[in-house]
């Protein structure tokens, strides 16, 4: 799943990365811009699908957790689950930072690159279109980061609130079921 998303991001980054272009390349560049726009939209759709596959809405994740851990004993450690989710979140954030850096680096560096890139161009390449696509990709990466963080459990405050509710008495496992199979303190 993550390999597919990362491959889509890598392909979009490589196809959108401006290279030095020979003169007379503007007509072909317009065609490439259309393809890059299509790839950006495909990437956005792929990230939405990926986030949905990771668990959907927070309420759906909670329902899935209740079903997933309903019959588990103490074989799943709460700290292990939190640690793995934290690791996945950090890995996704690092991958998206690398992708954003490959798209042009810091805003100052992008501005310097834009000045050099468009210094000798005629009016056949619209600078706003190119900057707009870069801005779109930046926003798409930011949205992907938010979607990924939400899919992994929401904000740190939300995860903490969920954990406090889920593990309030310390005697219950992930779903509120007692260790001996009793529910809500009732005997079988």
Swiss-Prot record:
Residues 27-170, 184-188 form a propeptide. One of its GO terms (cellular component) is extracellular region. The modification Phenylalanine amide is found at residue 180. GO terms for biological process: defense response. Belongs to the gastrin/cholecystokinin family. It comes from the Eukaryota. This is Preprocaerulein type-1. Disulfide bonds: none annotated.
């Amino acid at each position: 799943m993550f390999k597919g998303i990362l491959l889509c991001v890598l392909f979009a980054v490589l196809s959108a990365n401006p290279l030095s272009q020979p003169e007379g390349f503007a007509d072909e560049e317009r065609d490439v811009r259309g393809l890059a726009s299509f790839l950006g939209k495909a990437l956005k759709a792929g990230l939405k699908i990926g986030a949905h596959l990771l668990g959907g809405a927070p309420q759906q994740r909670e329902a899935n957790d209740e079903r997933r851990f309903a019959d588990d004993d103490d074989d799943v450690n709460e700290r292990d689950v939190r640690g793995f989710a934290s690791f996945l979140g950090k890995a996704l954030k690092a991958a998206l930072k690398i992708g954003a850096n490959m798209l042009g680096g810091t805003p100052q560096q992008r501005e310097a690159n834009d000045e050099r890139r468009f210094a000798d161009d005629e009016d056949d390449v619209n600078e706003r279109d190119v900057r707009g696509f870069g801005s779109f990709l930046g926003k798409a990466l930011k949205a992907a980061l938010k979607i990924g963080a939400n899919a992994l459990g929401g904000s740190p405050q939300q995860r903490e609130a969920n954990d406090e509710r889920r593990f309030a008495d310390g005697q219950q496992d992930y779903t509120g079921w007692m260790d001996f199979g009793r529910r809500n303190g009732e005997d079988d």
